[in-house]
């Protein structure tokens, strides 16, 4: 496949951003890494940013950093939310709906990765599936009407990991009671997130509710804190070594795809995967990359949606 050159040889760049005054962006997992850099980029253009983060201390520090960079009047705040707790996601969504009048984009950026040994969330889900997929599924559902009223977007930050592992959903053992591996479980969780996005696109199209656009992107290999926070010591060391090579880009570059998907008005193709288009699609100019068909296998997507509604106890009204 030829690299996408929609945005020229350098790909999408933040210079394309216009003034974002009056727009509100919600970002999950925005106190570090690509999520934090996305918040910076949006604030720089006068947007309002609400972070949805698990750690209060790290969020307070991130808000303080951003206000010291952009001034005390910068519109940045946080709401505490732990994606690993469905009850907590519901509380956070209530807070959002009580305090945020419009949502121009909800960027589902938070994730945990490479959890060394199998752990369960308080709801009994394998931790990566519970956090990355179920938590975001519920959050998007609870905020959907507000996003739709704002003619906003949902941006799912996926990972090239979807193309590793089983390349399908292990319906007979989604919580990995047998055969748990940090990478295979992570890959399934990211594939599930992509399938959620692509199935949502289909459901909205059938219902004629096309005000909300749903985009899927990935950061490529960016030097974010993902592996360093939840991976094993060996994985963290390997990643640290990799960050010293040209196969890894900065966290700021890693945020380009999600900011592009949240703001770029010329994007039209929603059944796509946006991200770096250079070597191995891990680095390089940002545009439309390769999307492998197992990510939108209709039978699997439809079944996953039904299972996810059952598991989360939340039924989308589309």
Describe these PLM feature segments.
Residues 147-150, 205:
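Helix-to-beta-strand junctions that scaffold the AdoMet/dcAdoMet cofactor pocket
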Residues 117-118, 124-126:
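Substrate-binding pocket helix/loop in short-chain dehydrogenase/reductase
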Residues 140-141, 198:
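A short, exposed helix-loop element centered on a Lys and neighboring polar residues
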């Amino acid at each position: 496949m030829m690299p996408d050159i929609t945005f020229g040889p350098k790909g999408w760049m933040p210079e394309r951003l216009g003034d974002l005054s009056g727009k509100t962006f919600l970002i999950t997992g925005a106190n570090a890494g690509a999520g934090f850099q996305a918040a910076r980029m949006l604030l720089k253009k006068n947007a309002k940013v609400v972070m949805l983060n698990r750690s209060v201390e790290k969020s307070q520090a991130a808000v303080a950093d951003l206000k010291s960079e952009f001034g005390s009047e910068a519109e940045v705040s946080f709401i505490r939310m732990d994606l690993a707790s469905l009850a907590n996601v519901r509380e956070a969504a209530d807070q959002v709906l009580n305090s945020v009048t419009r949502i121009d984009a909800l960027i589902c950026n938070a994730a945990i990765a490479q959890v060394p040994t199998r752990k369960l969330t308080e709801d009994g889900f394998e931790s990566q599936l519970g956090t990355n997929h179920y938590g975001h599924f519920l959050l998007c559902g609870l905020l959907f009407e507000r996003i739709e009223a704002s003619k906003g977007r949902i941006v799912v930050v996926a990972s090239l990991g979807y193309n590793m592992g089983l390349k399908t959903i292990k319906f007979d053992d989604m919580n990995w009671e047998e055969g748990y591996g940090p990478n295979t479980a992570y890959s399934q969780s990211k594939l599930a997130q992509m399938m959620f996005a692509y199935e949502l696109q289909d459901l909205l199209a059938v219902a004629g509710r096309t005000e909300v656009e749903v985009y899927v992107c990935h950061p490529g290999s960016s030097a974010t804190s993902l592996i360093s926070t939840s991976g094993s010591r060996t994985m963290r060391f390997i990643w640290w070594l990799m960050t010293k090579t040209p196969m890894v880009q900065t966290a700021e570059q890693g945020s380009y795809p999600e900011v592009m998907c949240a703001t770029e008005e010329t994007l039209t193709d929603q059944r796509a995967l946006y991200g770096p288009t250079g070597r191995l699609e891990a680095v390089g100019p940002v545009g439309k990359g390769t999307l492998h068909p197992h990510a939108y296998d209709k039978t699997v997507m439809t079944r996953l949606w039904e299972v996810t509604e059952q598991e989360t106890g939340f039924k989308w009204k589309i």
